[in-house]
Every structure is written in structure tokens, then in C-alpha cells.
């Protein structure tokens, strides 16, 4: 029975897309890591709580098959801010987040980072 669960989770991992623009923050990559941790021994792994494992698989599978998107259809593909899903993807990309963090830095911090001055050298 554990081998069946393992194969179902592997199939789910294959179907779940990985967003390369969200390095370290992608749900697909996180799910793959968790499956690798939970099934370290592959098909011979013993599952401690089979009911919880099956429930987790069912929940992830519903998300993967867009069950809730079809059950609760939206009239428009925008949020309350009138921003589309594509615009959200662009804003939440790791490259854009790095640029925004760089913009948040003050002028002195940017210059110090640019010239690689360490705080201890600054005081001496």
C-alpha cells in the first residue's frame, strides 16, 4: 500500500509545475522536497499515518486539478486591485523582488555595497 501512495505522490510531482522565477519560494519545488523527505526509502517506506497521507494527497490533487477554480468560477481574472494574474506573476518574480529590495536601500547603503566597504573598516 505504501508503494501505491509513493507512486501517486510521484505522479503528482510530475504534473505539478515548477516556477523557475520563484527560486526558493515555489510550491512545486517545496512539494517535491517534502515528498523526498517523507518517502526516503522509496516504495519500501512505511507510512506512519496512512489516513493523513491520503488526505494530504487528496488535497494537493484537488489543487493541482483546479477543483476549486472550477467549483467557484470567477467572473473576471483580476483581484480587487484590478491587477491580472500575469501582472502578479511578473511582480512576484525573484528578479523583480531583488530589484525592489535594492530600491529600498538608502543611497549610503547602496554606495557602501557598491564599493564593498565593511562596517568595521568604516570606523577605523
UniProtKB/Swiss-Prot annotation:
It is found in: Mitochondrion matrix, Mitochondrion nucleoid; Mitochondrion. The keyword Plastid does not apply. The lineage of its organism: Eukaryota, Metazoa, Chordata, Craniata, Vertebrata. GO terms for cellular component: mitochondrial inner membrane; mitochondrial intermembrane space; mitochondrial matrix; mitochondrial nucleoid; mitochondrion. The keyword Isomerase does not apply. Required for the assembly of the ubiquinol-cytochrome c reductase complex (mitochondrial respiratory chain complex III or cytochrome b-c1 complex). May play a role in the modulation of respiratory chain activities such as oxygen consumption and ATP production. May be involved in cytochrome b translation and/or stability. InterPro entries: UQCC2. One of its GO terms (biological process) is regulation of insulin secretion. Residues 1-13 form a transit peptide. The gene is uqcc2. This is Ubiquinol-cytochrome-c reductase complex assembly factor 2. Keywords: Mitochondrion, Mitochondrion nucleoid, Transit peptide. Coiled coil: none annotated.
Amino acid at each position: 500500500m505504501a508503494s501505491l501512495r509513493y507512486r501517486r505522490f510521484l505522479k503528482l510531482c510530475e504534473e505539478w509545475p515548477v516556477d523557475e522565477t520563484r527560486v526558493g519560494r515555489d510550491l512545486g519545488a517545496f512539494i517535491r522536497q517534502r515528498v523526498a523527505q517523507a518517502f526516503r526509502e522509496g516504495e519500501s517506506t512505511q507510512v506512519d499515518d496512512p489516513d493523513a497521507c491520503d488526505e494530504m494527497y487528496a488535497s494537493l490533487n484537488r489543487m493541482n486539478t483546479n477543483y476549486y477554480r472550477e467549483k467557484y468560477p470567477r467572473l473576471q481574472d483580476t483581484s480587487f486591485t484590478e491587477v491580472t494574474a500575469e501582472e502578479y506573476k511578473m511582480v512576484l518574480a525573484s528578479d523583480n523582488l531583488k530589484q525592489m529590495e535594492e530600491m529600498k536601500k538608502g543611497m549610503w547603503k547602496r554606495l557602501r555595497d557598491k564599493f564593498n566597504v565593511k562596517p568595521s573598516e568604516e570606523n577605523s
